[in-house]
């Protein structure tokens, strides 16, 4: 990856002009008249700042050459780590050892600043200021009184703060915007945007082929007891909507938080989905031994799977660029005759594009062992 390493582009010094000495003149020749050559005009200096209008309509003055950036939280960390990890001067939380197996090495040493939004909002301003970023970047979905929040933070720290909308429908545009803002990142931004465009186009075309009688009712669960659910309409369940399954969990007050809506066992029995997706770290491995779960259709028929979770959960947690993996994975898992491709090969391609990481066959097997490979063996 290029860009952000130095923050300044060097320009080669102009070559000295080559002149030829005129042949010697006879002493009787009249003196040669010379013309005054005007001094070269200095090239105009590049602007030090540019005006940027963010996704909230806020106009913010930014450095023209951005090489030091700070994410506002988990979603921003994931996206910025994909496009410009070497530009990051902070991280929301230190990646685990298992995550670092796939992520750029420099992320492990970055100071942690927490996050601006969410149930665990704990932005550490002292650490943020000490890292001396040129701009704080918030990415994700629009929520609450963001304009007031970002204006207040910007005034408090004296550093530009911007928001770029980056939910699944806006993610390609977000990568292109970042590619234009960050020094030397236009090509990288376009490569990531092209992958998002390819993914969403593929999903839209395939989802259109799914008729109502083919619709599979899917439930996506989280938490140690499996009763945290990402309901229909939730930001955390965007992949289900895009792929074309029916989200089996329908509630009145939809939560967009990471844990989703907590439901009761009675509600679980009423929903009784065709397929259950367990987030990594949930009860996938013990669910068949639990009488409260074993009577469910998905469990009794073996149609339950674990969502791959390295370096991040492929469906959400947080809902960010990891959803690109989730679209390819879930479509192929539920409708393999429509989303018709080799998911093992696709996984290797996606990790290479997103993280620059070459997955081995053994690593692919470990990632897909409780989902794609399990389904293929059924």
List where the protein language model places each region.
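Structural recognition of the beta-strand scaffold that forms the well-ordered cores
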Residues: 70-72, 89-92, 135-139, 160-165, ...
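Low-complexity, Pro/Thr/Ser/Glu-rich flexible segments characteristic
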Residues: 8-47
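A short, structured surface patch at a secondary-structure boundary
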Residues: 76-131, 135-143, 245-248
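C-terminal motif of bacterial Sec signal peptides marking the signal peptidase cleavage site
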Residues: 2-3
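A contiguous binding-surface segment within folded domains or other stable secondary-structure elements
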Residues: 131, 250-306
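Extracytoplasmic substrate-binding proteins
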Residues: 49-52, 59-61, 148-228, 308-371, ...
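Alpha-helical, coiled-coil/dimerization segments enriched in small aliphatic residues
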Residues: 117, 229-259
